[in-house]
Amino acid sequence: MRHRVKKKKLNRPHSQRLALMRGLARELFEHGTIITTTAKAKAVKPFVESIITKAKKAALYAKEINERSNGDPEIQALRSKNVALRREINRHFNDRKLVKKICDEIAVNYIDRNGGYTRIIKVGRRRGDAAELSILQLVETKSEENVEN
């Protein structure tokens, strides 16, 4: 019975599955969209969304740090929370430039959005093995949609 079993195994051992998740998430954050199998897209979506949620919290702390004066006693606590969240994100990728991009560019776009940062669009089947392919992409924010129109 599969009671309370949430994650997909993708027919891989734990270390390979974790490496796959990190690789897919890295490509998604770098390029904004990736084409992969539907099973992999569904498996990586919660991983990406949790990272964006942590980055949003770090971005909010950074914004509050910038708004407060340097003499404020709570500013040190905010800085430590911001650094802790960035380190938690960095634990997955081990790339400071990518963490900076996630926290300072990507997460800022989703400050007003409560979840649902990615979308999966099914595009058909792969030619070689007929695996179902999907596009996993970051959802555009309202500010980007207004610029395009």
From Swiss-Prot:
GO cellular component: cytosolic large ribosomal subunit
PANTHER family on file: LARGE RIBOSOMAL SUBUNIT PROTEIN BL17M, RIBOSOMAL PROTEIN L17
HAMAP family: Ribosomal_bL17
Domain of life: Bacteria
Biological processes per GO annotation: translation
Presence of the UniProt keyword Ribonucleoprotein in the record: yes
Subunit relationships: Part of the 50S ribosomal subunit. Contacts protein L32.
Keyword vocabulary terms for this entry: Ribonucleoprotein, Ribosomal protein
InterPro entries referenced in this protein's UniProt entry, alphabetically: Ribosomal_bL17, Ribosomal_bL17_CS, Ribosomal_bL17_sf
GO MF annotation, one: structural constituent of ribosome
UniProt family annotation: Belongs to the bacterial ribosomal protein bL17 family.
Name of this chain's protein: Large ribosomal subunit protein bL17
